[in-house]
């Protein structure tokens, strides 16, 4: 049985197009027997914003404040969740050409030297290996493979840095460029999702 972690990151609630696609994917994969865990980073599972105190605490050490200890424990939980699943599905709507702050915050909690990556004499090495990632990205305009897409290249870089190099991408483009473009973008994205195996 495939174990899947789904990360939602939209802040738009019931208006979220990425959530529609993620729910479609979850339903599709559940019929294939996948065990799915959902973390709604833009909703009920929003994380504390990583500030200087938290960032310092995530390095560990003996002299941690109570808050730092709590945030380190939260980070450990998120990392364990990441490592426990075979496939990581990331809902990544484009906000102002990049990812939502809530998703970036999750990255800041799990990208830890000595935990999810390390530095060697030949450069960095990811420690979260043998995983697969699926990015489901929605955007109001048409940005795929262009200079204004700071979503997919960035996420591929981060995932590769921690060891996840098997990355598939589902695009839903031009969703704010009229009803026909919206319907076409969502239909094509759902078709792409239907081709994915859990």
From Swiss-Prot:
Q: Where does FMN bind?
A: 10, 16-18, 94-97, 138-141
As its record notes, the protein acts as a catalyst of:
2 a quinone + NADH + H(+) = 2 a 1,4-benzosemiquinone + NAD(+); N,N-dimethyl-1,4-phenylenediamine + anthranilate + 2 NAD(+) = 2-(4-dimethylaminophenyl)diazenylbenzoate + 2 NADH + 2 H(+)
> Which cofactor does this sequence's record say it needs?
FMN
Q: How many cofactors are bound and how?
A: Binds 1 FMN per subunit.
* Originating organism: Shewanella baltica (strain OS185)
HAMAP family from the xrefs?
A: Azoreductase_type1
Q: Name one GO molecular function term.
A: FMN binding
Q: Which UniProt keyword terms apply here?
A: Flavoprotein, FMN, NAD, Oxidoreductase
Q: How does it assemble?
A: Homodimer.
As recorded in UniProt, its EC number(s) are: 1.6.5.-, 1.7.1.17
Q: Which PANTHER family match?
A: FMN-DEPENDENT NADH-AZOREDUCTASE 1, FMN-DEPENDENT NADH:QUINONE OXIDOREDUCTASE
EC main class here is oxidoreductase
Q: Which InterPro entries match?
A: Flavodoxin_fold, Flavoprotein-like_sf, FMN-dep_NADH:Q_OxRdtase_AzoR1, NADH:quinone_OxRdtase_FMN_depd
Please report the name of this protein according to its UniProt entry. FMN-dependent NADH:quinone oxidoreductase
* Assigned protein family: Belongs to the azoreductase type 1 family.
Pfam families found in the cross-reference section: Flavodoxin_2
Question: Its gene?
Answer: azoR
Free-text function comment from the UniProt entry = Quinone reductase that provides resistance to thiol-specific stress caused by electrophilic quinones. Also exhibits azoreductase activity. Catalyzes the reductive cleavage of the azo bond in aromatic azo compounds to the corresponding amines.
